[in-house]
């Protein structure tokens, strides 16, 4: 390796201008590619693509599109939300006019008209059918018309009241809405068709965007459109301290997540760069030009890395988005070692050629070994099926090698260029000592206590290993604070805790069979509700009641027809209108005809009725192309327990072929074993590869043991600390273990390589010479990864915390335990 590195030194010394021009051209090209990279924030982009549980869930999303909906929330502090119906109407109309929106649902009376109006008795439960029977009697008609008159004469009457009374003078809508409000277990109130909470605090408008939440370009335009519409509505309605507007729903979360991660990535990149360079300058007190060279070297490597990432993947996901902070912390290590040695040699000799050859021949082998082991460990993560960790491993592995190449060629070329411009322009002695002398004295005076302390620490850590836990709750990787989720909790409090649903789907070979299966499913859903397994549900029955319920309604309609004279009912209606001062409008004839036709229904509706219905919400429950139906099952208090999920899975299996149960809770539960197993395999592969590389470098098993001791002990201490403190793994930070194998091995490599080169037989002298650089490498790594702890998404933040703990543990082991072990073991030989 030394021969090759010396040749690199000669190449750099003789062709530094060519190298810099070539590197600059390549950097310009890759920088242009960086601006094309998309940042995907959907958690599905970080999960495996070929897992049955995920495939079923993704199929559900593709078939029913339930994830792509937005909820606009109007809130009234004074519980006067019905004062804002006109605002809701104005908002609804503006939303309908937008090209970004497929449809809007804010008033149930404005949707599902064709089927519902013609066949409304089929949608009524038993109590509502009895109410219909009473409403159509002579007494019922007279009572309702008198109530209409009283309402219109009231000083609180609104234009909307007049319109509703004109359209439906018998107020049959109240009967229909009462029946519909009983379909779920939530506390939704439907007043004049609007979706409001029963405490009169909230009103909801449901929006279906025209594009997917995974289409980043569309999401940006859609977000601007929604903001514009809401602002226009506020200005039109005027400022009102009682009124608040907000966004909720999966689509709102996707918009918020994209904005949050994008902002976090930019801030984190800037923060990590500043921390690394401030730390570098504080410790080494280099001239400003050295900072420029280090910055150019790192940014060149980062540009190459992200350019290749675009060519390979085209985008970054939630996990791989942190690669900038990682490379800032790791890449500076190679610069520190090579430049410091170059500076030291130049100060002693004054010869630039010698000062370049010596660090490349003597120091660079350890740097190359460290970089290769680090990248190999990162590449080991590709053995996992989780796309987030897989992508992170490849990009980070490429990035480490890019930092190495950039250091060996770009940094050294810049050093030669600057020194040829003016000798002594870069190099100066000085810098912080980090208390290295004190550490050396401790190692010299207390070797045995250090050994015993290390053994005790490892023993305590091993005890903690038994308490390591994995959190498979999606919230463990979600945002720390989210306005969307906070509003979702408010909605749950006001409307009932209908969130975190499981989805059950049924498919059949034809419509007739699907209708039968749908009826079976509805009966079982009612049974599950009675058993207390579920708290509520939403299903196709909102648009098409099961056939057996329709038949029950048809039988009741027969009884109503027998009890009423339809012609007499119309005469009573017209007479009562005149007696109360109403004009008998021509449209009332059509109105009464519609009622008469509805009462004369003799056959139940089939799925064909849905396919002729223009209500877009039906797609959430019925896919006519694939002949699939879906129902949404809601848990008690918004959270599923393991026993309920297992019982529902067993019940679903008992329903037979064609029924499938899915949901995020099921999906993540099924992935837990997989991610743990694959992470252990990746870590084992990383350890084996690292061991082989270390052996090729040092050519002795005992030396391999010594070099790897700080890594093994540091990882054990980290895991034990997590177990003892209750810190849990999740789907993102579990990748930190494999990353730590690649990061922590470097410290042992640097210490032992320095020992071999200097032939220092005392452990304190090893620390005296190499300790400062090792501490600085650890601190810059902490600056890079530690900055992740400030990010909003818990998964990424916790990964930064785990790696920071691991780096500190590996550093302590390398600085204290390794020199003492070197002293004892090498002295014996």
Question: How should these model regions be labeled?
Answer:
Residues 1-41, 413, 417, 421, ...:
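Signature of alpha-helical transmembrane segments and their immediate interfacial
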Residues 34-78, 181-194, 440-441, 449, ...:
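Solvent-exposed, non-transmembrane loop/terminal regulatory segments of multi-pass membrane proteins
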Residues 86-203, 240, 244, 532-613:
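Alpha-helical transmembrane helix bundles of large polytopic membrane transport and channel proteins
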Residues 157-282, 286, 519, 589-690:
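Extracytoplasmic
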Residues 288-338, 703-751, 786, 816:
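Hydrophobic transmembrane alpha-helices and their membrane-interface caps
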Residues 311, 328-343, 363-364, 368-383, ...:
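Transmembrane alpha-helices and their membrane-interface boundaries in multi-pass membrane transporters
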Residues 347-384, 708, 760-791, 811:
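Pore- and gate-forming transmembrane helices of large, multi-pass membrane proteins
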Residues 447-572:
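Juxtamembrane segments of multi-pass membrane proteins
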